[in-house]
A protein has these predicted regions:
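The feature encodes the CheY-like receiver
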Residues: 56
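Acidic, metal-coordinating helix/loop segments flanking the phosphotransfer/catalytic sites
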Residues: 30-48, 69
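Alpha4 helix (beta4-alpha4-beta5 surface) of REC/receiver domains from two-component response regulators
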Residues: 62, 83-98
Length: 152
């Protein structure tokens, strides 16, 4: 099973992320700071990182940058309560796979996780939402994300 790191300083949000993904059989480790996650990644490997944007010390964006500069190639999904157009542009330039505003919908996050991992979507409701959304998409990734969020 794929291994996911969750980097979130708010315990309730960390729990919601882990709980929302646990039914899909992922191995999940949580960290309260990006520094802790980075130290862990120096010794181990994950398949995906889900990180808050604003963290004490190193930010989720800084962690994504370090991952891109290093030997790490796993996708990064950012969750934030502080997103704006400039932040989203910077996240995209860094190579972040997706970004979610808090509060987020768990079904859409799961869809993004499966897509980022290149895995088939096993749960029927999410699979139907992905099929409906994909059939509507003919434009940019931004339009696709909007359609996926509306479809689910």
């Amino acid at each position: 099973m794929p291994h996911i790191l969750i980097v979130e300083d708010e315990p309730t949000t960390a729990w919601a992320l882990a709980e929302g993904l646990s039914d899909d059989g992922f191995t999940i480790d949580t960290f309260r700071t990006a520094e802790e996650a980075w130290r862990w990644l120096q010794r181990s490997r994950s398949d995906l990182v889900i990180s808050d944007l604003r963290l004490p010390g190193m930010s989720g964006l800084d962690l994504a940058r370090k991952l891109r500069r290093g030997r790490h190639a796993q996708p990064v999904i950012i969750v934030t309560a502080y997103g704006n157009a400039d932040t989203l542009r910077e996240l995209r330039q860094t190579g972040v796979a997706d970004c979610f505003s808090k509060p987020f919908r768990v079904d859409l996050l799961r869809l993004a996780v499966h897509r980022a991992l290149g895995e088939p979507i096993r749960r029927p409701r999410i699979r139907r939402a992905a099929t409906r959304a994909t059939s509507r998409v003919t434009a940019t990734p931004r339009v696709r994300r909007t359609s996926l969020r509306k479809a689910a």
